[in-house]
């Protein structure tokens, strides 16, 4: 029997998402049009937020052939007044999957580095049209690109590039894609509407394919401070991340070529071309403290090789084997590999140790992680049963696993730093709810910062009742890092918390007119999918959501009680006005008298009292 050999292939990130675009929210023309809108609008808002610019975002969707039935090609354009993108970055930013500026540990709407590029990829595979990018980053020159994406190579193909004069900074992105606006229209309008609620400092305009304009001007002029990039927290680290951090902490052995030798000569202040090995080392010893690290490494290598500059230029360093104290190099003159023994007692041995074996454990902890000081680092070393001076580059695979496990279990690390987060704020959130819903009652809360798996997060929540709110509540508006989440609500942690609440306990019955607005901001939102539509039910996040909702529900319960008391006062006043005259008449007849008692003054006093009480209750409710 003949055997069939398996064929192994490697595919690029763009080819993977081309075959699995459902993962990023591009499953059908309806969802894809909505997702593309989201990605470009969020990129525009993120760019403005990072530079402290009050955003002006203009969204346009135009049918290529208005007479054709859906699904059909649409031209989607998003224009902003942000900082723009430098010309050299545009091709990679819009023509490469998993390339971008959002991979640092900071709060941002985008986090996977593929959303906008996936929209461009979807447009290309459904209409075969390039993306058009117009960017002005200096306020003077606009660079206009037409770009296609080479799916197999995950590289951009520049179809066209022109420049022209411009008067202001900003970015415009336009793609042609297959969509179904007849089905996606409601979601897109809801998205723009809800984005305006959670970003009251932004002005967003939407021109739809039917010629309608939806304008949402800003009503808050104070923009929240931009989020900042932070170092990771020890509780949010795994083995692979530690391994990468160790590599980053290690200093590469410099290439010893003519340029490096000239740099060493310059830093040592050597004017004489030919100096002996001894003269060079004496000069280096005097200037050691002022020499940069690269030069120190070269001097350390020279000390063991016993070579001057002329001989040093004829070799290449191959390896530094610290455990065996050997230095390997290639001799171009003899065309062979050679090795020498290194003296561990030499003053230069430590320099090479630092270069090859990395930082000591305590230095690694204090320099690479947030909120870890020398005292905590020493305590952790004892907890992990590692020597504080242990070099990170000497850890075995098992020691790395043990280190990762110890980082997760050590309880004396401080809580993650939340100063990097940029929540919307209770006051802007309340203003947004009042503007959009005109409620009879509104209450908001911003919970103290908390953390899950080493990632800080803050919960903001608002609750509103009555006014322009439709019945059938609670209506839940979910946000994460100021992104409206409109799909897949059934599996979201916020919906879980709302559904678990016994609303009858808070005097809310039937299908009342009330809403809940929930906002989670974090350096790492635990989305369930790359489509960023629902948040996983992490225990810490669920707890904070519950506490926020319970606090607001008690406020709502108090409002409902006082509202009930006010209504009862009005009812009592109406009852007095209706029945006291009748009682007076019956009493007069029963007593055989002709003149009725003077009940009007008493009635006026009682009605005035009940009315005053009702007004007082309503005023108290209105002031909440």
Regions found by a protein language model. Give the residues of each.
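Conserved tyrosine-mediated DNA breakage-rejoining catalytic core shared by Y-recombinases
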Residues: 258, 314-352
């Amino acid at each position: 029997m003949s055997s069939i050999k398996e064929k192994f292939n490697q595919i690029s990130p763009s080819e993977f998402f081309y075959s699995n675009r459902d993962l990023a929210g591009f499953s059908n023309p309806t969802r894809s049009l909505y997702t593309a809108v989201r990605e470009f609008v969020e990129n525009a808002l993120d760019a403005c937020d990072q530079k402290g610019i009050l955003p002006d975002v203009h969204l346009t969707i135009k049918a290529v052939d208005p007479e054709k039935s859906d699904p059909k090609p649409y031209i989607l354009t998003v224009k902003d007044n942000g900082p723009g993108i430098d010309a050299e970055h545009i091709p990679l930013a819009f023509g490469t999957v998993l390339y971008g500026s959002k991979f640092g540990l900071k709060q941002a709407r985008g986090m996977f580095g593929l959303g906008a590029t996936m929209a461009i990829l979807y447009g290309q595979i459904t209409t075969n049209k390039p993306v058009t990018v117009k960017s002005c980053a200096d306020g003077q020159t606009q660079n206009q690109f037409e770009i296609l994406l080479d799916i197999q190579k995950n590289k951009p193909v520049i179809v066209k590039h022109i420049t022209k004069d411009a008067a202001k900074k900003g970015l415009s992105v336009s793609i042609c894609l297959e969509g179904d606006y007849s089905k996606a229209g409601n979601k897109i309008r809801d998205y723009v509407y809800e984005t305006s609620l959670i970003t009251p400092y932004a002005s967003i305009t939407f021109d739809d394919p039917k010629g309608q304009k939806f304008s949402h001007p800003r009503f808050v002029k104070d923009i929240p401070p931009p989020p900042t990039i932070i170092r990771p927290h020890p509780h949010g680290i795994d083995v692979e991340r530690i391994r990468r951090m160790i590599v980053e902490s290690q200093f590469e052995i410099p290439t010893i070529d003519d340029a490096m030798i000239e740099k060493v000569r310059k830093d040592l202040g050597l004017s004489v071309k030919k100096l002996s090995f001894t003269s060079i080392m004496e000069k280096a010893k005097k200037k050691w403290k002022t020499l940069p690290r690269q030069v120190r490494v070269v001097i350390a290598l020279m000390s063991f090789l016993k070579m001057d500059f002329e001989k040093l230029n004829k070799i290449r360093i191959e390896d530094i084997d610290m455990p065996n104290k050997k230095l390997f190099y290639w001799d171009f003159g003899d065309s062979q590999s050679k090795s020498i023994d290194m003296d561990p007692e030499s003053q230069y041995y430590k320099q090479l140790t630092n270069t090859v074996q990395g930082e000591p454990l305590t230095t690694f902890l204090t320099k690479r992680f947030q909120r870890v000081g020398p005292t905590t680092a020493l305590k952790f070393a004892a907890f992990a049963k590692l020597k504080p001076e242990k070099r990170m580059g000497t850890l075995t695979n098992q020691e790395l696993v043990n280190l990762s496990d110890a980082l997760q279990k050590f309880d004396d690390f401080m809580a993650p730093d939340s100063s990097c987060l940029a929540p919307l704020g209770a006051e802007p959130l309340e203003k947004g709810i009042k503007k959009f819903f005109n409620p009879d009652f509104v209450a908001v809360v911003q919970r103290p910062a908390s953390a899950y798996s080493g990632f800080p997060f803050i919960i903001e929540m608002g609750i509103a009742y009555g006014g322009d709110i439709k019945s059938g509540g609670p209506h839940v508006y979910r946000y994460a890092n100021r992104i409206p989440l409109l799909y897949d609500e059934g599996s979201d942690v916020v919906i879980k918390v709302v559904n678990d609440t016994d609303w009858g306990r808070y005097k809310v019955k039937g299908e009342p007119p009330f809403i809940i607005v929930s906002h989670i901001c974090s350096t790492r939102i635990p989305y369930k999918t790359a489509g960023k539509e629902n948040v996983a039910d992490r225990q810490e996040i669920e707890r904070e959501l519950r506490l926020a909702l319970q606090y607001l529900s008690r406020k709502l319960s108090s409002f409902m009680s006082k509202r009930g008391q006010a209504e009862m006062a009005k009812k009592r006043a109406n009852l007095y006005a209706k029945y006291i005259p009748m009682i007076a008449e019956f009493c007069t007849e029963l007593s055989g008298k002709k003149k009725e008692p003077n009940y009007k003054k008493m009635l006026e006093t009682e009605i005035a009292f009940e009315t005053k009480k009702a007004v007082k209750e309503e005023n108290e409710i209105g002031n909440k």
